[in-house]
Design a protein with these regions (language model features):
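Conserved class I S-adenosyl-L-methionine
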Residues: 1-46, 58-59, 81, 158-160, ...
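C-terminal alpha-helical "lid/dimerization" subdomain adjacent to the S-adenosyl-L-methionine
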Residues: 8-9, 25-28, 143-202
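Class I SAM-dependent methyltransferase SAM/SAH-binding core
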Residues: 50-102
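Short glycine-centered segments of the SAM/dcSAM-binding site in methyltransferase folds
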Residues: 68, 139-141
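A short acidic, Gly/Pro-enriched loop at the edge of an enzyme's catalytic core
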Residues: 101-113
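A short SAM/SAH-binding and catalytic strip from SAM-dependent methyltransferases
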Residues: 112-124
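A short glycine-rich, Lys/Arg-flanked "PGG" loop and its adjoining helix->strand segment in the class I
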Residues: 126-138
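C-terminal lobe and adjacent flexible extensions of AdoMet/dcAdoMet transferase-like proteins
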Residues: 202-211
């Protein structure tokens, strides 16, 4: 699907790129202001919380209102880093290696589902978002931080022209349209903001289940 890659190839790309992603956290979290966005939106998470594509656990410290925290990621490299970083944490996180597009949880399992900078890397982002919707309680919420195609034309053209390199190096579709993906997955946007040339999105979503 993505550059004609199989799921196995996609996972291999992510495991290879995991260490570089972890090492680049300063520029992403501080320079680009992602840490500030994490604190702002994930402080809204409450009850039983699921972090889809939890990576090395960068969201966990911001889940201050959570009753329980469960994290899932398809990268064993990322999960190993998450386990190490959580070793002395004052809270417990239940970590799982698994597929965001086939979550091994019953329907309506979580009060809040969160994900950050992940839909760009899911093999099938629509299916992953629909799975988040499925496991979220009808009166729950889904909180996302995502990145996509810039609203500034010069930046957007750069993203388009270098998409192939981004996929090959890190398995990232950096010119996607996150809000369109969310709508296509059947979720309702309650609140959304865009920052940094329109690249970064924060979204509060409702599962919007019928019946």
């Amino acid at each position: 699907m993505l550059n004609n890659k199989s799921r196995t190839e996609w996972l291999q790309i992510h495991n290879r790129a995991a260490r570089e992603y972890i090492n680049s956290q300063w520029s992403r979290e501080i320079l680009f202001g992602v840490a500030k966005q994490r604190k702002k939106i994930f402080n809204q998470a409450s009850g039983d919380v699921l972090d889809v594509g939890c990576g090395y656990g960068m969201n966990f410290p911001f889940l201050t209102q959570a009753k329980s925290i469960t994290g899932i990621d398809f990268s064993s490299v990322m999960l190993a880093e998450a386990r190490e970083s959580m070793r002395n944490a004052p809270f417990k996180v239940d970590l799982h290696e698994g597929d965001a597009e086939a979550l091994e949880f019953p329907n309506n399992s979580f009060d809040t589902v969160i994900s950050s900078l992940s839909t760009c890397s899911f093999f099938d982002p629509i299916k992953a978002l629909q799975e988040m919707r499925r496991v979220c309680k009808p009166d729950g919420k889904i909180l996302l931080i995502e990145h996509g195609r810039s609203t500034w034309e010069w930046a957007a053209k750069y993203q388009d022209n270098h998409l192939h390199q981004q996929i090959e190096m890190g398995g990232c579709r950096w010119n996607q349209e996150p809000q369109e993906l969310v709508k296509e997955a059947g979720l309702t946007i309650l609140h959304a903001t865009r920052t940094l040339l329109g690249v970064f999105h924060t979204m509060v979503l409702s599962p919007a289940k019928d019946g």
